[in-house]
């Protein structure tokens, strides 16, 4: 698999909107604040034509224009990495117009986004043999202060961090509103490691803190599946979907 070059000091970050753009609040103000942060850190910014658009259905613009923006910004030699402006609903409609064959021949470039951006991240990996980053979209970097996950995401883009880990707490309900676009994540829920079965929920016989490793999870997998119970184990770093007999 091909990996893009890391974002260098004083490098250029490109922004595209293959899904939603940052045309409405709170995303517009959050994205603008994020730009101030990146500029202060010495980065140059290259904004695609759709980043503030909202005329599309479930995406920033027409499928053709969204794909054209992505094609052009991926090919730009003066853009080091790409960050998506947001998630959305219908990025799938741009895929027929994305030139994956040409992208496959291009120098690999990091593209980061989440949710609807899976449409591109998955196909970059499977069709273009190019790695991407499932991570925060551009507007998230406008929060004050940054959550540790945002710091880590930038460290991954710059090559300063090559490992990922979980965080102690997660957000159940966000506090960001049109009136308060820069509030940080509302992390209130403690992370727990659990094993679930399709039939009766949590029933491993172990409390989350007792499951120490993936090997523990695998042992539970073998024990439970041998009893004919398909289930899913949510591990600290990965999801292991188990169906049938191991």
Give the location of each predicted region.
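ATP/NTP phosphate-donor binding region
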Residues: 1-78
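Structural motif
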Residues: 81-83, 112, 232
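Conserved anion/nucleotide-ligand pocket segment
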Residues: 132-246
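Long, hydrophobic/aromatic-enriched structural stretches that serve as scaffold segments
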Residues: 75-98
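Short amphipathic alpha-helical segments
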Residues: 27-28, 94-97, 124-126
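Gly/Ser/Thr-rich loops at beta-strand to alpha-helix junctions
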Residues: 20-23, 86-91, 115-119
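Short, acidic/small-residue loops that bind anionic groups at enzyme active sites
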Residues: 98-123, 131-138
């Amino acid at each position: 698999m091909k990996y893009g070059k890391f974002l260098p000091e004083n490098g250029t970050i490109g922004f595209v909107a293959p899904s939603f753009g940052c045309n409405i609040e709170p995303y517009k103000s959050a994205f603008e604040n994020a730009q101030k942060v990146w500029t202060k850190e010495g980065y140059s910014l290259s904004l695609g034509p759709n980043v503030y658009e909202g005329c599309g259905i479930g995406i920033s613009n027409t499928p053709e224009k969204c794909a054209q923006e992505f094609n052009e910004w991926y090919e730009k030699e003066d853009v080091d990495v790409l960050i998506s402006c947001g998630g959305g609903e219908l990025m799938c409609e741009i895929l027929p117009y994305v030139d994956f064959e040409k992208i496959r021949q291009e120098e690999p470039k990091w593209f980061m986004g989440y949710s609807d951006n899976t449409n591109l991240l998955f196909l970059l990996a499977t069709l273009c043999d190019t790695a991407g980053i499932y991570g925060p979209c551009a507007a998230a970097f406008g929060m004050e202060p940054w959550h540790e996950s945002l710091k880590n995401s930038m460290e991954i883009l710059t090559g300063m961090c090559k490992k990922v880990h979980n965080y102690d707490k997660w957000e159940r309900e966000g506090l960001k509103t049109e009136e308060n676009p820069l509030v940080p994540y509302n992390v209130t829920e403690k992370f727990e490691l659990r094993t679930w079965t399709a039939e009766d929920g949590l029933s491993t016989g172990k409390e989350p803190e007792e499951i120490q490793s993936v090997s523990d999870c695998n042992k539970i997998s073998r024990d439970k599946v041998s009893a004919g119970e398909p289930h899913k184990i949510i591990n600290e770093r990965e999801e292991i979907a188990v169906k049938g007999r191991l």
